[in-house]
Structure formats: structure tokens, C-alpha cells
């Protein structure tokens, strides 16, 4: 077995059971990995120097094929309603079979770190079958200094072999695709999928398990910080504007997706970004667009024309086209990945029912309620003529990645908000003047004006009214914003229709939250929409 590149000489792949490999390439850099990926036919070179790969059958995550080893340590720690279990015995058979499958292969290894805060960092070794996967994860996680590699000690190892097909009977899984996580021993096995995002989200899942034990809050969010050190956190599901609204030329970007919150402040888990590329335009998102024209960026499932120019409007392979690039490709990105204690939390929702106000102030209890709810609404199946909005509740704004019970994260968040005096806002980027099909999308200039007032603190001085349906505080007037739009009922042509729609949404919140009722205290239960109205 030939071994190339810089590494800790005392920790080779044989230490985790690999044998009879052809060549192992440790910590290769972008130019080397380009050469490998192109020579092996894994990817194409684009006209502007990015690397473009296709993932085949799997163009997104496979949440139904993700498993956590259920053992003595995890049995009482994992939220099994939301996480599928695999036995230690099945996992061991899977591990041995994957190691046997790798015999004769050339593999790529990256020694990286999850977490910009040294006290809460997770040194991670990623072993991949594909060279482009090695570059992808090198872009996404934090790269240690080259001088640190000879002493690198991983606490988590990820083995990603897309050509391995799992056997559902033999391996105790659902299909040929498997993402199996042994939290006790720090090992993740990925097989049967070429989708690179599985590696990134596996690191996130492990950090989401480990950090609460240290009273550190892991978050599926973006974050930025102003010139005065005023950190803001943006929670929000896909399509709510999290990436767009946190990209502010007047503020430093900490990160776009995964962060931790400790007693010292906020820190990015990653060293890169994994941005959606479908319908990407230079006019709308110039900074992200510019990364697609840089050497080192990895594009996933983006269609190229015969001149090797990307067509970002072509979703024929998938709507989930992506580009992965190091954070330093963004001009105003933080060099440290850390920021002071948050002053503001923004919870984004795209309410397609058109009943939520464009902004509302939340108490700590209401913030926990809405964090556990993780609400947005999307317009489902419009291409088939279905125009009825569909409510989506994804707890903690990232249910697929939360191994512990949501109440653990919710209580951590509530305590951190109270301890640091953080102001929380719910921001609706969805519809106004009616539901989807009748109303219109909330103007982005209105959202930005309200966000600016929230972030600079001036909105705290506004006059507020209590919303009759949801119980939160809504500003009556904000400079530069038409007062009428702040009261959603007044924007509807039919006030009675608004009341009916609002009550329907309140009922959806209550029905969804029923599963959390016994896990939260009375103050959070009392923060439910409709609770205040019922009490009065």
C-alpha cells in the first residue's frame, strides 16, 4: 500500500481496519484533487475553473436511510421517534463488509475540524472513494494548519464508499443506501449514495449529539455580526430567506448553515458554504455567483453546455443543484468563524397562509415555542394545479439532524436567551394581503427595513400591540414602512376570511405542539397561539 501526503504517521487507515489498499492520498489540496478527479472521470472542469460532478440516482439526502446505533450509551439519549435505530451487531457487520469492499481501492483522506471554537471542536477524519468528495469536504469543514497534521488525532471518522451497496437483510437497513452513525465510537459509514451533503450533515448530527452535554447549543442557522460586535442568528427552513437575509454587505458573515452557542459566544461549525445553485444569478446573489467562477469550487448536479458553461436555470438533473466553496471565497466572511454573544435572534417563516405579521417580538417562552414548532408554509404541487398552502413543521428548524429530543435544545435555547438578554423576532417573508393565490409575496424591501430596525435596536422603542390570535407583540409603526402592512388583517379584503384562516393556522400550531406538551413547563405551554385569547 502506497501512502502519499502529510499525516500523523502513527494513525494510518490500518488503525481502523483497512487492509490491502492500493494507494492512500492524505490531505491532498485542490489542484491535486482536481487532477485525480479529472483523470478518474469523476468530474468535469468548467469554463471558469470550478469542478462539476454528478451524483447519479441520489441528488439529495436520504433521511429514511439514516441510522443511529442503539447501544447502552444512546438508548436513553436519542429521540427515537425521529431517528431510526441500527443494532451494534448489524453495524459491525456493515463495517466489516465496507472494509472488505475497499480492498484494492485507492482512497482519499482529509483530516479536518468541525467547530471553530477550539474548546468545542471535533477533529474529523473523512475517508472517501471519490477525489471530488475529498475536495468537497475539504471545502466545507475547517482545515487545520499544515504543521498540525503530523499530530492530528481524530475523534470522528467518516467512511464514504458510494460503490458499496448495503444488504437490507444482512445489515439491518431499508435499502442499498445506508448512512449509519455509531455515536459511542465516533464512526459514520456511508454507502450507496454519491450525494456529498451526507458527509456534511453527518458531522452536524454528531455535534448536535455531543455539544448539549457541555451546555453548548448546536443550531441549524446562519449568523452574522455588525461593526459594534452585535451578533445576529437567523433560524429558518428552506425557502424562508435565511441565506439571502444574513448576507449583508454591512455585516460580517460568520456562516450560512451550522453554528454553536456557548458561554463565550457563537462559532461556526464549518469552514465553507453549500449554497443552492438553481436559478442562481449574478444580479440577485453576486457573491455566491462569483464563487462558481473560481478554482476550487465544487458544483454538484449543475448542467454544463458544450462549452462547459453552467446553466443554473436547468433543473433537469435536480432542483437541488449546489455549489460548495470555502468561506473565504465570500468577501465579508469572518476569518475566525467566531463572534460575541448574540444580541438578536431572527426566526424566519414564509407563511403562505398570509396571516402572520411581517415582524413580531417574542418573549423567551414564545421563542422556545416557535423554535420547537419550526413552522413555515410552502405551496405544494402548483405545477399540478394545487394551490392550497401546506404547513410544514420541522422542530428546531432542522428535525432530520437532531438526534436528541427537541426539548433538550429548546431548554438550552431558552436559558441562553434569558441569560444573555437576547431580543427575539419572528419575521414572515411569506404572503401579505391574502393567502397564496390571492395575496402577494412580502416585499423584500419591507423585510430588509424591518430587519435593519431590529438589528440596530431601534425597533425595541416602537409601540406594540398584542396579536389577538398568536399573542406576540407586533409593532404599530416603523419608520420607512407603511403602517398598514404591519397589521395583516387590514391587508385582507375580507376581515372575516382572515379570522378564519388565522384560526386554522392557530389550530395547526396547537395540533403539532401536542407531542411536546409534557416536555415543556407551563410558561412555554402558555406561550402557545390562542392560549392568551382563551385565558381572556
Swiss-Prot record:
Substrate binds at residues 61, 195, 201, 322. One of its GO terms (biological process) is gluconeogenesis. The keyword Manganese applies. Its cofactor is Mn(2+). It comes from the Bacteria. Its EC number is 4.1.1.49. Binds 1 Mn(2+) ion per subunit. Mn(2+) binds at residues 201, 220, 257. Keywords: ATP-binding, Cytoplasm, Decarboxylase, Gluconeogenesis, Lyase, Manganese, Metal-binding, Nucleotide-binding. ATP binds at residues 201, 220, 236-244, 285, 322, 447. InterPro entries: PEP_carboxykinase_ATP, PEP_carboxykinase_C, PEP_carboxykinase_N, PEPCK_ATP_CS. One of its GO terms (cellular component) is cytosol. It is found in: Cytoplasm. This is Phosphoenolpyruvate carboxykinase (ATP). The gene is pckA.
Amino acid at each position: 500500500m502506497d501512502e502519499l501526503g502529510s499525516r500523523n504517521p502513527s494513525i494510518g487507515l490500518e488503525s481502523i481496519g483497512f487492509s490491502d489498499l492500493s494507494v492512500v492520498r492524505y490531505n491532498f489540496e485542490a489542484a491535486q484533487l482536481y487532477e485525480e478527479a479529472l483523470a478518474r472521470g469523476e468530474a468535469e472542469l468548467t469554463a471558469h475553473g470550478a469542478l462539476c460532478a454528478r451524483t447519479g440516482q441520489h441528488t439529495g439526502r436520504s433521511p429514511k436511510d439514516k441510522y443511529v446505533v442503539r447501544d447502552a450509551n444512546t438508548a436513553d439519549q436519542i429521540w427515537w421517534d425521529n431517528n431510526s435505530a441500527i443494532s451494534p451487531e448489524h453495524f459491525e457487520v456493515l463495517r466489516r463488509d465496507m472494509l472488505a469492499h475497499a480492498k484494492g481501492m485507492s482512497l482519499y483522506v482529509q483530516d479536518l475540524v468541525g467547530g471553530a471554537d477550539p474548546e468545542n471542536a471535533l477533529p474529523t477524519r473523512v475517508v472517501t472513494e471519490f477525489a471530488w468528495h475529498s475536495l468537497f469536504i475539504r471545502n466545507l469543514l475547517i482545515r487545520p494548519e499544515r504543521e498540525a497534521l503530523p499530530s492530528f488525532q481524530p475523534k470522528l471518522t467518516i467512511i464514504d464508499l458510494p460503490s458499496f451497496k448495503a444488504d437490507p437483510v444482512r445489515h439491518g437497513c431499508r435499502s442499498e443506501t445506508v448512512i449509519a452513525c455509531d455515536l459511542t465510537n465516533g464512526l459514520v459509514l456511508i454507502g450507496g449514495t454519491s450525494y456529498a451533503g451526507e458527509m456534511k450533515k453527518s458531522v452536524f448530527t454528531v455535534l448536535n449529539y455531543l455539544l448539549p452535554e457541555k451546555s453548548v447549543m448546536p443550531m441549524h442557522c446562519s449568523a452574522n455580526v455588525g461593526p459594534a460586535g452585535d451578533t445576529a442568528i437567523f433560524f429558518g427552513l428552506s425557502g424562508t430567506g435565511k441565506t439571502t437575509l444574513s448576507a449583508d454587505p454591512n455585516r460580517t458573515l460568520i456562516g450560512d448553515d451550522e453554528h454553536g452557542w456557548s458561554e463565550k459566544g457563537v462559532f461556526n461549525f464549518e469552514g465553507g458554504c453549500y449554497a443552492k445553485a438553481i436559478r442562481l444569478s449574478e444580479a440577485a446573489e453576486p457573491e455566491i455567483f462569483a464563487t462558481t467562477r473560481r478554482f476550487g469550487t465544487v458544483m454538484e448536479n449543475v448542467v454544463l453546455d458544450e462549452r462547459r458553461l453552467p446553466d443554473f436555470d436547468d433543473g433537469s438533473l435536480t432542483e437541488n443543484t449546489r455549489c460548495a466553496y470555502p468561506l473565504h471565497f465570500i468577501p465579508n466572511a469572518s476569518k475566525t468563524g467566531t463572534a460575541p454573544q448574540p444580541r438578536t435572534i431572527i426566526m424566519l417563516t414564509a407563511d403562505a397562509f398570509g396571516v402572520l405579521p411581517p415582524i413580531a417580538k417574542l418573549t423567551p417562552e414564545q421563542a422556545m415555542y416557535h423554535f420547537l414548532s419550526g413552522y413555515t408554509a410552502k405551496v405544494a404541487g402548483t405545477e399540478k394545479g394545487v394551490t392550497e398552502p401546506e404547513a410544514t413543521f420541522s422542530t428546531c428548524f432542522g428535525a432530520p439532524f437532531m438526534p436528541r429530543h427537541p426539548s433538550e435544545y429548546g431548554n438550552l435555547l431558552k436559558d441562553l436567551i434569558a441569560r444573555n438578554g437576547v431580543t427575539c423576532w419572528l419575521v414572515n417573508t411569506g404572503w401579505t394581503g391574502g393567502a397564496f393565490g390571492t395575496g402577494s409575496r412580502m416585499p423584500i424591501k419591507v423585510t430588509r427595513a424591518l430587519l435593519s430596525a431590529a438589528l440596530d435596536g431601534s425597533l425595541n422603542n416602537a409601540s406594540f400591540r398584542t396579536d389577538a390570535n398568536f399573542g406576540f407583540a407586533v409593532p404599530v409603526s416603523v419608520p420607512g414602512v407603511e403602517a398598514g402592512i404591519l397589521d395583516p388583517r387590514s391587508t385582507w379584503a375580507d376581515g372575516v376570511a382572515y379570522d378564519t384562516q388565522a384560526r386554522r393556522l392557530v389550530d395547526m400550531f396547537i395540533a403539532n405542539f401536542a407531542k411536546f406538551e409534557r416536555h415543556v413547563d407551563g410558561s412555554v405551554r402558555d406561550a402557545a397561539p390562542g392560549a392568551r385569547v382563551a385565558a381572556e
